[in-house]
């Protein structure tokens, strides 16, 4: 009887964790980049010919970027570089960076409400 009770508890807990994972939706890239989630938002980092673009959405809807500030820190082996993120339409852009496979990127953002958000990526 005890084993049956423990099995029921384990099954219930696994079902709860599955629903929590589904609540945030899928992390599929919309712009061909690498996706990460933080602060209930989805972030997509995309390598561009001039640097990088960062798209932000909230459950599939683009986030208003007016007043958002931040920077990208790029770690490629022993090399470290940084660039300021600026609003460019529906995305934030950082120029002068080179993103290659295996590069680690940290986005440090500040929202208009002065909330700090840190997002980490590994370029694939």
Features from the language model and the residues they span:
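Intrinsically disordered, low-complexity terminal tails/loops enriched in metal-binding residues
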Residues: 2-7, 14-124
